[in-house]
């Protein structure tokens, strides 16, 4: 399987390393032609406004949105969640707007408030997973067509809608590939 990782900033190398560790091909996506022949894409963490601006400057935003709308399996982590959200609290700038969620940026606090926790996400695995939150957003509202996958402190931190999964946390910053494996083995995959 060929998995693209949007490669403007964030945990690009970490995502690529985990993809390759599972025996798949990981490719960097920086321009429109990089979207050709990928089976799935990951939108990593980073600074969402910077990534959003780069998507617009490069012209990648339109073709990426079309690919995702046509069913490309997509996983957004942290900033990726913000890019995919239909609405971001206190932010007028819109990006992909492909998931029926409302998100609060930096909702858990600043860089100094970043934290790790452990949790069993029953819809993903019976085993406890380490969840790493770095200036993380969380979801404040979901429409009925969105399936909540995980909450931490009563805050929605993982969800799924059709071919899109989002997480507030960064599984790529751990040695645990459980969440990536779940994404790649989901029923939408070829």
UniProtKB/Swiss-Prot annotation:
GO cellular component, one term: cytosol
Keywords attached to this entry: Glutamine amidotransferase, Hydrolase, Lyase, Pyridoxal phosphate
Active-site residues annotated for this sequence: 78 (nucleophile), 170 (charge relay system), 172 (charge relay system)
GO biological process, one term: pyridoxal phosphate biosynthetic process
Presence of keyword Hydrolase: yes
Biological pathway: Cofactor biosynthesis; pyridoxal 5'-phosphate biosynthesis
Recorded GO MF terms: glutaminase activity; pyridoxal 5'-phosphate synthase (glutamine hydrolysing) activity
Pfam family, one: SNO
CDD domains hit by this protein: GATase1_PB
List of residues binding L-glutamine: 46-48, 105, 134-135
SUPFAM superfamilies xref list: Class I glutamine amidotransferase-like
Region forming the signal peptide: none
Enzyme Commission numbers on file: 4.3.3.6, 3.5.1.2
Catalytic reaction annotation: aldehydo-D-ribose 5-phosphate + D-glyceraldehyde 3-phosphate + L-glutamine = pyridoxal 5'-phosphate + L-glutamate + phosphate + 3 H2O + H(+); L-glutamine + H2O = L-glutamate + NH4(+)
Keyword Lyase: yes
Protein's job: Catalyzes the hydrolysis of glutamine to glutamate and ammonia as part of the biosynthesis of pyridoxal 5'-phosphate. The resulting ammonia molecule is channeled to the active site of PdxS.
Annotated HAMAP family: PdxT (MF_01615)
Family that this chain belongs to: Belongs to the glutaminase PdxT/SNO family.
Subunit structure as annotated in this protein's UniProt entry: In the presence of PdxS, forms a dodecamer of heterodimers. Only shows activity in the heterodimer.
Protein name: Pyridoxal 5'-phosphate synthase subunit PdxT
Native organism: Clostridium beijerinckii (strain ATCC 51743 / NCIMB 8052)
Phylogenetic classification of the source organism: Bacteria, Bacillati, Bacillota, Clostridia, Eubacteriales
